[in-house]
């Protein structure tokens, strides 16, 4: 029998339906893989007993012909999603050993459809980071290494545990979240597929908040088909989330293999950065050529406010974060560090509970929201955001179906290599992805090639609001042309 962990989610679904193997066998194979891959530090909480119980239940349901769309499929869950009776910390000391008494809407829908939970996945603290180095559980290792090198690389962030676990074949797919690129950048760094759906497509209820107007849940998977299968279960209207949009969820899987003939693909001239590596430029041209060969039409488009996106994002996101993170005060749950007064208790708890990057962003956010600077920074950033959104609207109004860009400005870098002295160096990782969150649009990252050192590189497709289907169709064209890449096992 093939090693069960090497199957795609779609292949595993067929094997379970055909009774070639059971969910318990599939789950056990992944639990063994997780145990053998602890050096990657992808999981911060393993739930083997719960996983086996869920797998047995799935097998019973499949036996009766009552299995749901994800019956028996073992998944990893980012530690930002509340999981009932299972520790959820957002990878921050301040949440301590917090155990939710409720389930996030997205994970509840996965369990409704029969999925199995293998455990909780590592991420940057409160999803603030682009390398998964800010987690209180320590950094995550990327399953990929440079050819001939033993240097451990970052998997990207903030959903680094999700991307690493999927790439290392520790789970068949994973939940993730994306505020400025936290699904797409790790996917590009690990040769996995990651989609950030349109804002409002997936419920945010029960997900630890970072920046509420930007956060969106989505899947990281091995293939575009697998990502489409997962997104169908994760998406849907939720009355508990006022930003959730009440529109039907299409069958995303049906978009896989659909013709892209006649589609107009925008190539934005503003994404050609000064000093952009030749490998990224070449990859972008190759991706465009593949789409053209499949019958799509390439058109140059302009997104003139792109250059303001990153500074505007790093005002809006910290501003919302400083407000959202005010609730962690040591009074109701999580860490409490005593003080002589209530004010001192707050100060001590937050100083000890938050890591350096979270403290930095809370300070930036508080500063830009303060009386003297609110108009100069926050209001101006919101105006820029409106202009960015308008750029995309103008582009789509001209008949463009999707926009093709690089996913990241480079391949994965070494743990500890960036952002030590200058956080802006780390923030520049989000240069191609933040515009999508600022405009609330869907974006997918698909593996498209490797750099000269054998590291994966990804391309990004940006779609019209609620048109994730087109992204899956186009993404699959790139996937078929580029082929699939798997890392050489070192862990």
UniProtKB/Swiss-Prot annotation:
Q: What keywords is this UniProt entry annotated with?
A: ATP-binding, Ligase, Nucleotide-binding, Protein biosynthesis
Q: Does the keyword Nucleotide-binding apply?
A: yes
Q: Which GO terms describe its molecular function?
A: ATP binding; glutaminyl-tRNA synthase (glutamine-hydrolyzing) activity
GO BP, sorted A to Z: translation
- Reaction(s) this enzyme catalyzes, per UniProt: L-glutamyl-tRNA(Gln) + L-glutamine + ATP + H2O = L-glutaminyl-tRNA(Gln) + L-glutamate + ADP + phosphate + H(+)
Read off the Gene3D superfamilies from this record: Amidase signature (AS) domain
Task: Please list the residues that make up the active site.
Answer: 78 (charge relay system), 158 (charge relay system), 182 (acyl-ester intermediate)
What's its EC? 6.3.5.7
Against Pfam families, the record matches this protein to: Amidase (PF01425)
This protein's superkingdom? Bacteria
Q: Which InterPro entries would you find in this protein's record?
A: Amidase, Amidase_CS, Amidase_dom, AS_sf, GatA
The similarity comment for this entry is:
Belongs to the amidase family. GatA subfamily.
Instruction: Summarize subunit and interaction data from the UniProt record for this chain.
Output: Heterotrimer of A, B and C subunits.
Kindly give the PANTHER family that the UniProt entry links to this protein. GLUTAMYL-TRNA(GLN) AMIDOTRANSFERASE SUBUNIT A (PTHR11895:SF151), TRANSAMIDASE (PTHR11895)
Recorded protein name is Glutamyl-tRNA(Gln) amidotransferase subunit A
Which organism is this entry from? Bradyrhizobium sp. (strain ORS 278)
The beginning of the lineage is: Bacteria, Pseudomonadati, Pseudomonadota, Alphaproteobacteria, Hyphomicrobiales
């Amino acid at each position: 029998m093939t090693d069960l962990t090497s199957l795609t989610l779609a292949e595993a679904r067929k094997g379970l339906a055909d009774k070639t193997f059971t969910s318990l066998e599939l789950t056990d194979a992944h639990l063994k893989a997780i145990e053998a891959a602890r050096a990657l530090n992808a999981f911060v909480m393993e739930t083997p007993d719960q996983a086996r119980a869920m797998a047995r239940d799935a097998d019973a349901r499949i036996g009766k012909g009552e299995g749901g769309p994800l019956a028996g499929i073992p998944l990893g869950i980012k530690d930002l999603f509340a999981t009932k009776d299972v520790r959820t910390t957002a990878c921050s000391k301040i949440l301590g050993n917090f155990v939710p008494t409720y389930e996030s809407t997205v994970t509840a829908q996965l369990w409704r459809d029969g999925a199995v939970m293998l455990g909780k996945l590592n991420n940057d603290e409160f999803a603030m980071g682009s390398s998964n180095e800010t987690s209180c559980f320590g950094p995550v290792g990327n399953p990929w290494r440079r050819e001939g090198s033993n240097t451990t690389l970052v998997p990207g962030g903030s959903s680094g545990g999700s991307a690493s676990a999927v790439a290392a074949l520790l789970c068949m797919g994973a939940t993730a979240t994306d505020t400025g690129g936290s699904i797409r950048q790790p996917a590009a760094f690990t040769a996995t597929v990651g989609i950030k759906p349109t804002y409002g497509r997936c419920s945010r209820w029960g997900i630890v908040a970072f920046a509420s107007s930007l956060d969106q849940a989505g899947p990281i998977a091995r293939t575009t088909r697998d990502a489409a299968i997962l997104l169908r279960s994760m998406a849907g209207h939720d009355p508990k989330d006022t930003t959730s949009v009440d529109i039907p969820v299409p069958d995303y899987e049906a978009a896989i293999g659909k013709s892209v003939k006649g589609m107009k693909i925008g190539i934005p001239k503003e994404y050609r950065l000064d000093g952009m590596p030749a490998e990224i430029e070449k990859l972008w041209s190759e991706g465009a050529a593949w789409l053209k060969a499949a019958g799509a039409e390439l058109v140059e488009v302009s997104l003139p406010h792109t250059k303001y996106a990153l500074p505007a994002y790093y005002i809006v996101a910290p501003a919302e974060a400083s407000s959202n993170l005010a609730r962690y005060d040591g009074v109701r749950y999580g860490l409490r560090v005593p003080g002589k007064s209530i004010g001192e208790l707050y100060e001590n708890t937050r100083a000890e509970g938050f890591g350096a990057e979270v403290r930095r962003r809370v300070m930036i956010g508080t500063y830009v929201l303060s009386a003297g600077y609110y108009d100069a920074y926050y209001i101006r950033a919101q105006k820029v955001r409106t202009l960015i959104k308008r750029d995309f609207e103008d582009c789509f109004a001209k008949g463009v179906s999707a926009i093709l860009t690089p996913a990241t400005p480079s391949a994965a870098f070494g743990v500890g290599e960036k952002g030590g002295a200058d956080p802006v160096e780390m923030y520049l990782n989000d240069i191609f992805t933040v515009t999508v969150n600022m405009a609330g649009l869907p974006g997918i990252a698909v593996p498209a090639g490797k750099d000269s050192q054998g590291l994966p590189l990804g391309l990004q497709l940006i779609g019209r609001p609620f048109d994730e289907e087109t992204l899956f169709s186009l993404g699959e064209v790139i996937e078929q042309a580029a082929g699939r890449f798997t890392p050489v096992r070192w862990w």
